[in-house]
């Protein structure tokens, strides 16, 4: 089996591929952490654009009902123990399983260690290390 972990916004980009997973009986467990937000977009708008937010909040479907409408197994969890049990069930299920896990907003982010913030103005440098033009 394959385990996929994504946020709600990222999952929605390709959620209809669930139909293919059901059709071919692909053993896939997808954990969707749902905070009703494009978290990375929101974070960038907050940090890089002085909190000017646009199109970062989501109005999501019920992911359990959504998955079941394709014929996939699905369940909703609220605690780490429930997630562990749901993952074990999903790994032993034939075909795809969606696990929706509610997530609180504004959790600490690792992005400050992963990506550099944008630089604008006279100190901007292009990707090859030269001066901005």
Each PLM stretch: what is its role?
Residues 1-133:
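Thiamine diphosphate
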């Amino acid at each position: 089996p394959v385990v996929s972990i994504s946020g709600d916004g990222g999952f929605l980009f390709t959620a209809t591929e669930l139909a293919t997973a059901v059709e071919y009986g692909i053993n896939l467990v997808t954990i969707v952490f749902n905070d009703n937000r494009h978290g990375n977009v929101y974070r960038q708008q907050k940090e890089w654009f002085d909190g000017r937010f646009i199109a970062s909040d989501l109005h999501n479907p019920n992911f359990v009902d959504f998955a079941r409408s394709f014929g996939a197994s699905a369940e909703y969890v609220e605690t780490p123990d429930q997630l562990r049990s749901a993952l074990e069930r999903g790994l032993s299920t034939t075909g795809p399983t969606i696990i929706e896990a509610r997530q609180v907003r504004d959790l600490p982010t690792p992005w400050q260690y992963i990506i550099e913030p944008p630089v604008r103005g006279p100190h901007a440098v292009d990707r090859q290390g030269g001066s901005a033009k």
